Amino acid sequence: MKIHEEIEGHIGRTQAESEPWWPTPAHPGDDAPNVVVILLDDMGFAQLGCYGSDIDTPNIDRLASGGLRYTNFHVTPLCSPTRAALLTGRNHHEVGMRAVSNFSSGYPHMRGHITDHAATMAEVLRDEGYATFASGKWHLAAMEDASAAGPYDQWPCRRGFDRFYGFLEGETDQFHPELVYDNHAVEPPTSPEDGYHLTEDLVDHAQ
């Protein structure tokens, strides 16, 4: 089997006649913006101060004032399809997420995960040199693919994220969560008796 690899150096007959070459790592540029995406389940856009709500949301409003605000993103009543659309920028039907990702239906375009033919936002950013991290709920892999034994191909670290801390399925216990750190199942750092709560733990790892 012949394997061809592009090289900008030179391969001569001997090492002395050869010139090595290393590709330049991708870099987004010194002026590249940070990209922060916050997805909340069961909340409407009108509940945020930056969209005119009377509810005080100063931290979210501060992020919005220095970034971009969209007004026409299509959401669904289900979690996984909305997440798939947000991460890919495409209609959820086009990327194989017609319903929640709890199981593979056995039919095309409903395998319980984003199709491998669709790039995620994290994959695009990573290829441009960004460091990528996700914290929280994933819910984009079928339950049979979410065990500690894998397969891991639809886990966050295989869909563009360098690091991940959170849980893979649609829900988990807030005091005794089934946590994943990158590609490893881990125990919560403390117990509920010592004040543990999942929300605070996720925020701590996101900082």
Predicted features by range, described:
Residues 1-207:
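Formylglycine-dependent sulfatase
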